[in-house]
Regions:
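Basic nucleic-acid-binding interfaces
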Residues: 1-133
Length: 133
């Protein structure tokens, strides 16, 4: 099985480990909301041709290991993931979010962590992400 993405003029394997935290580090990514947030993030990745290798949450942080295209910047990926998941979360779970975020339609902190990874360390990062939550 070839793990590389084949394009007309390139062959690549670009992967990044992303971590988002909720605004004010609120511990709200639980239960049904946790599953919904993961689904929103996954669907956004599929729509943009990013491939989720692993994703897990632990009340507040969300860890995602994804493979992306060389035409996409990490900043762009993070922005799209946060925007779409926030919008959908407020549409579907406004009662929950209004308890924590008064008058502001926010979900994520402005900050994020991103680390590019090589294939040598992928298994280690996957185990780490699987053990979250």
């Amino acid at each position: 099985m070839d793990i590389y993405q084949h394009r007309r003029h390139n062959k690549n394997l670009l992967m990044v480990h992303l971590i988002f935290v909720t605004k004010y580090r609120k511990k709200i990514v639980l239960g049904d909301f946790r599953d919904a947030v993961k689904q929103y993030l996954f669907n956004t990745c599929v729509k943009n041709h990013w491939y989720v290798k692993r994703m897990e949450t632990d009340q507040d942080p969300v860890h995602i290991l994804l493979q992306y295209n060389p035409t996409d910047s990490i900043t762009h990926i993070v922005s799209i993931l946060k925007q779409h998941s926030t919008y959908l979360s407020w549409q579907q779970h406004s009662a929950l979010l209004e308890q924590h975020y008064w008058k502001k339609h926010v979900l994520w902190s402005d900050n994020y962590f991103a680390a590019s990874i090589g294939t040598v360390s992928q298994a280690v990062i996957e185990r780490y992400i699987e053990n979250q939550g």
